[in-house]
């Protein structure tokens, strides 16, 4: 909520004191003081807190007029990956894929991309969701299938740290059919190998995170002798807010059902196993000469 606007402020002049707003600029780049953290949502990667932020004129701010209250977490999660969602949506509408595969670290984010893929070629897209086997301890396959509904034709749990063995499971399950597009949301080393292994020649692999081994994926595609279009993480998009609102409006029933599943799941107990896999080989958090913060 806006507490004060200085007379010299030349940013979004439509905003006024008392407005509820969403900041599309990463908070890591702004002066921030936290008084208290009241709750942590492990499923959506969000915290509720009290404090203050100083927003400059260059900061991208929008007035929150949609999905207030408990539903705001859906919108905030979509806006967290705003640029990637918008870019992948444009690419898929251009491609009109018949088969997409999503390597998902988080069911919510995976659902966003499944919806985007489905909307890119309505009624003609076969969405496959792949998750690391460590998640099978907290998410029942049948419950995930029920939550995703028509957004996921099939769901697989495989060991992403052994990508060649995982690819054999997928080849067998999909009768040898490769995907037109693969969206890699996972940071576990090996996911990028699996992505390039199961994408078609002249297909596309989308990398959506800071730690998804993008450059290694380029080398792997070359080793497989495939011509692959690599779509990378993107940043701020002017149309991010209306795009996210439209996306969430089309996903509310599925998100409500996914919430019920995540509320039953013990998300904390899976973190140790996932982090162990993330730290394999290059344990110092250094990947392809880029250092990123955890």
Model-derived features with residue positions:
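Hydrophobic beta-strand signal
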Residues: 21-23, 101, 206, 231
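Glycine-rich phosphate-binding loop and adjacent beta-alpha segment
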Residues: 186-250
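Glycine-rich beta-strand-centered segment in the early N-terminal region that forms part
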Residues: 1-29
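C-terminal hydrophobic helical "lid"/dimerization subdomain
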Residues: 237-294
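Conserved S-adenosyl-L-methionine
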Residues: 96, 118-128, 201-202, 226
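Adenosine-nucleotide cofactor-binding segment
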Residues: 118-190
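Short helix-loop-beta connector
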Residues: 92-100, 176, 201
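NAD(P)H dinucleotide-binding glycine-rich loop of Rossmann-like/cofactor-binding domains
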Residues: 22-97
């Amino acid at each position: 909520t806006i507490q004060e606007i200085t007379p010299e402020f030349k940013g979004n002049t439509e905003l006024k004191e008392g407005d509820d707003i969403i900041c599309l600029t990463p908070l890591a780049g702004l002066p921030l003081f936290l008084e208290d953290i009241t709750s942590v949502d492990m499923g959506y990667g969000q915290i509720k807190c009290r404090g203050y932020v100083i927003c400059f004129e260059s900061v991208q701010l929008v007035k929150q007029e949609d999905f207030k209250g408990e539903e705001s977490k859906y919108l905030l999660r979509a806006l967290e990956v705003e640029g990637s969602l918008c870019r992948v949506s444009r690419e898929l509408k251009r491609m009109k894929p018949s088969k997409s595969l999503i390597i998902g670290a988080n069911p919510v984010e995976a659902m966003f991309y499944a919806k985007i893929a489905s909307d890119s070629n309505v009624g003609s897209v076969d969405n496959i969701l792949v998750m690391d086997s460590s998640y099978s301890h907290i998410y029942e396959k049948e419950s995930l299938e029920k939550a995703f509904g028509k957004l996921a034709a099939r769901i697989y749990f495989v060991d992403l740290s052994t990508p060649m063995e995982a690819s054999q499971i997928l080849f067998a399950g999909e009768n040898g059919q490769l995907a037109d597009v693969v969206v890699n949301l996972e940071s576990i080393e090996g996911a990028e190998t699996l992505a390039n292994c199961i994408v078609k020649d002249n297909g596309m692999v989308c990398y959506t995170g800071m730690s998804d081994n993008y450059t290694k994926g380029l080398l792997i595609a070359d080793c497989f002798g495939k011509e692959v279009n690599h779509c990378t993480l993107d940043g701020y998009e002017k149309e991010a807010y209306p795009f996210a609102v439209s996306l969430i409006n089309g996903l509310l029933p599925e998100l409500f059902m996914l919430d019920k599943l995540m509320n039953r799941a013990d998300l904390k107990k899976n973190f140790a196993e996932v982090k162990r896999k993330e730290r394999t080989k290059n344990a110092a958090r250094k990947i392809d000469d880029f250092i990123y913060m955890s």
